[in-house]
A protein has these predicted regions:
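Short, charged, intrinsically disordered terminal tails
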Residues: 2, 110-116
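Short leucine-rich amphipathic alpha-helices used at interfaces
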Residues: 6-7, 40-41, 116
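Amphipathic alpha-helical interaction surfaces in cytosolic regulatory modules
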Residues: 26-102
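STAS-typified acidic loop motif
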Residues: 3-35, 52
């Protein structure tokens, strides 16, 4: 049975904001991130925010996908931020070192301000 995850994409000032709600695990990670890659399309000069406010759990495969998306963004002169992490999710991301690689801020508004500067 597939675990529930919802990802809503919105755009603001040319920035792709992906809002996550639910849990990312083995049952839904491939499908979820395939949809994100498709929605981003060409990574050239793209600006992305992953708003993790509603994300309650993520597994190692999901972390790999997040790192891979960041790598694609960076290689193509784009920028990416993570925002609004739940404490448990933030602890996991810090533990594996993602927060030392991908800029992480408290709010979407902070990420937008950084991406506009």
């Amino acid at each position: 049975m597939e675990t529930l995850i919802e990802v809503n994409k919105k755009e603001q000032d040319g920035i792709n904001i992906f809002e996550f709600s639910g849990e990312l695990d083995e049952t839904n990670a491939d499908k979820t991130f395939a949809a994100i890659y498709e929605q981003v399309g060409d990574f050239t000069n793209t600006k992305i925010i992953f708003d993790l406010k509603g994300l309650k759990y993520l597994n190692s495969k999901s972390i790999w996908y997040i790192a891979d998306i960041f790598s694609n963004v960076e290689e193509n002169d784009g920028k990416m931020y993570i925002s609004n992490c739940d404490e448990g999710v933030k602890d996991v991301l810090e533990l594996v070192g993602i927060t030392t690689i991908i800029p992480t801020v408290d709010t979407v508004e902070e990420a937008i301000a950084e991406l506009k500067s």
